[in-house]
């Protein structure tokens, strides 16, 4: 068996829920690319050791909890990622580690595909990590009326999000137009970020979690008559941009088919 020409992967903790290994390896196989994609579980305290060897890989995605802390180890950071303050993709070029944020494109893809315009809307976001920063950046850039963050630790969230003009509260209420989950709650069908909220017609529920595609939060909101947007579309959107950066192009139909196969395999 020939060794791969390119080694890509995902780092995070945990990574057991990720469909990336199935998606990208199937995509590479279908496109005839001699490449491999690995899932690598990296504890926060061992990130610095991994990064000392990271340039041996051709590129890797970054997920919770490393999207912010990884920026300290990179040689270059794309202007969009730097302005957001979060990196979810690293590419090795000429021995240098370059950081990008493809989540932003995934968020844009998800809202456009779902036919949701955030302009003039009052919005609450659960979470204050890297993906929350990216979502907030998108909302402000696209003229949301107001953005509130729901966080368990208000002081910590204020420190993390001090670059943004947002209100931070411990609880949400029924007064918002759009509710967005940017926490791991719902992964593997466990947890609800907005248990205190009563959903109904006219409200929109959005989840960045993609496994499962319909989380308990989205299911509850959908049953109540609210419009729902799945994190699976965010995943597809960011994967399109990821492949553009790592392989200089993306066959969108092949990618979407690979995602569908992966979702069916992990059910």
From Swiss-Prot:
Question: Entry's NCBIfam families?
Answer: PRK00258.3-6 (NF001322)
Q: Please name the PANTHER family in this protein's record.
A: BIFUNCTIONAL 3-DEHYDROQUINATE DEHYDRATASE_SHIKIMATE DEHYDROGENASE, CHLOROPLASTIC, SHIKIMATE DEHYDROGENASE
User: What role does it play?
Assistant: Involved in the biosynthesis of the chorismate, which leads to the biosynthesis of aromatic amino acids. Catalyzes the reversible NADPH linked reduction of 3-dehydroshikimate (DHSA) to yield shikimate (SA).
List the GO cellular component terms. Answer: cytosol
Active site located where? 67
Q: Name one GO molecular function term.
A: shikimate 3-dehydrogenase (NADP+) activity
Question: Quick one: which pathway?
Answer: Metabolic intermediate biosynthesis; chorismate biosynthesis; chorismate from D-erythrose 4-phosphate and phosphoenolpyruvate: step 4/7
- GO biological process annotation, one example: amino acid biosynthetic process
Q: Which reaction does it catalyse?
A: shikimate + NADP(+) = 3-dehydroshikimate + NADPH + H(+)
Q: What is its EC number?
A: 1.1.1.25
**Which positions are annotated as binding shikimate?**
63, 88, 103, 210
Cite the entry's keywords alphabetically: Amino-acid biosynthesis, Aromatic amino acid biosynthesis, NADP, Oxidoreductase
UniProt-recorded name of the protein: Shikimate dehydrogenase (NADP(+))
| Family as reported in the entry's similarity comment | Belongs to the shikimate dehydrogenase family.
User: HAMAP family this protein is in?
Assistant: Shikimate_DH_AroE
Keyword flag Glycosyltransferase: no
The gene that this protein is the product of is aroE
Q: Where does NADP(+) bind?
A: 127-131, 208, 231
Subunit and partners: Homodimer.
């Amino acid at each position: 068996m020939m060794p791969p020409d390119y080694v890509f992967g995902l780092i995070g903790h945990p990574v057991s829920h990720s469909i990336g290994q199935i998606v990208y390896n199937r995509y590479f196989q279908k496109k005839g690319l001699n490449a491999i994609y690995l899932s690598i579980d990296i504890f926060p305290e061992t990130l610095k050791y991994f990064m000392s060897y990271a340039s041996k890989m051709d590129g890797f995605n970054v997920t919770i909890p490393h999207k912010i802390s990884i920026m300290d180890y990179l040689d270059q950071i794309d202007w969009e990622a730097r302005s957001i303050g979060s990196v979810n993709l690293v590419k090795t070029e000429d021995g240098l580690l370059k950081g990008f944020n493809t989540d932003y494109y995934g968020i844009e893809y998800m809202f456009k595909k779902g036919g949701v315009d955030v302009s003039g809307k009052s919005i609450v976001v659960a979470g204050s990590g890297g993906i929350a920063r990216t979502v907030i950046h998108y909302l402000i850039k696209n003229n949301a009326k107001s953005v509130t963050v729901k966080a368990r630790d208000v002081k910590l969230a204020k420190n993390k999000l001090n670059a943004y003009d947002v209100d931070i509260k411990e609880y949400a209420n029924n007064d918002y137009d759009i509710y967005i989950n940017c926490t791991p709650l719902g992964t593997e069908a466990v947890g609800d970020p907005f248990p205190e909220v009563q959903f109904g017609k006219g409200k929109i529920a959005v989840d960045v979690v993609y496994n499962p595609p319909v989380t308990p939060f989205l299911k509850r909101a959908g049953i109540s008559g609210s419009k729902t947007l799945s994190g699976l579309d965010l995943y597809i959107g960011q994967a399109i941009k990821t492949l553009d950066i790592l392989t200089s192009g993306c066959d969108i139909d092949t990618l979407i088919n690979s995602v569908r196969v992966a979702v069916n395999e992990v059910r």
